[in-house]
């Protein structure tokens, strides 16, 4: 049942890290769609792999759809996307499972300056609204990074998406 089981997750940078994570029982792995990815999938055959669509790598929702399908064809279970709602909605409408992101989003860190997000009531409401917008756009998962635990708990209880907490 949602919110009852916690699944260990990590981000890996190479195949050896993927193998070590998988052998340690880590069930959710995120990685980049680089030359190591096919080996990562081979070494972690049943792990849930969320593979990143680099922010700015594509310039239109149509390019994102094409690239998303390429990532899925390589063996990903979901495509990580921190692009705008328009990109996420277009990809989701085509059946691409999307892992979205709220809170501290490193590639958008100029907005947050690498700090916890959601500590004020106004910011917490903005984070929660962003989650609802992502859910309405069709995202399957949301990575909630460096937000207060109370905000993360509220998000988990009030969305149908899979929530992945980092630093919460």
Where are these regions (language model features)?
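Alpha/beta enzyme core
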Residues: 1-168
